Amino acid sequence: MARLLIYDAYENKVYTYANLNENNPMPYSTGTTLRVREFRGKSASPTLWTTIAAMEAWTLTRRKYGKGIPVGYAFRRIWEGGHGTRSQHYAGVSFDVGQSLTRTARTAIYNAARGTGAWGYVEPLSQTPTWVHMDRRYGTPACSGTTAGYPTLRRGSRGCYVMILQDALSTLGYQTGSRIDGIFGARTEEALKGFQRRTSLRVDGVCGCNSWKKISTAVIGVGRTKTTID
């Protein structure tokens, strides 16, 4: 069973789906084209998250391609690792697919994904020779000179990047609350200030480029700790 958080950027709200069966379809996806277990992949997390926009992009791509798309990797928590320090997989908006398919089939999926215009980024096939990468990143990256990474967050922010921040801070021992909720409130701000203070960053309660770099580097792949929340 899984608890699923879905961020609605259109309304700036976070919706919670409790006790989803692993064979249930992902909310906002078409039919059974993407089940919870496929989105989860190898993650052992009881709590998952994504966005409505990512599910809409998946649905459009699946419809355009016209047949099943095997998912190799989708959701991961940042402390589980397996991807780069600022991977969109940790936000639940990234898919690596088609690993078991032929090059021709992967090219067709790539063209379908590009053709929808719904993804934030579809990686060139020259960089993904045995899979197709597509993600629905959103927001302006906190670090300049790149289209990758996470946006600046502060009190009042909402969404999947706040979920990454809460996940990372709690795992590092800075408590943001009893559960991950994707809402940057007073406790998340104080937890961030605590991390900033201890790591000699500017203590302003704003998660910008430097804070993201230090937090990501400190937490990636460390595994679940006794202070990790779900």
PLM feature segments, named:
Residues 4-7, 85-93, 99-172, 178, ...:
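Catalytic cores and adjacent binding grooves of peptidoglycan-active enzymes
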Residues 220-230:
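C-terminal extensions
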Residues 39-43, 151, 177:
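A short, mixed-charge helix-start or loop-turn motif at secondary-structure junctions
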Residues 3-128, 132-136:
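Cell-envelope/glycan interface and biosynthesis
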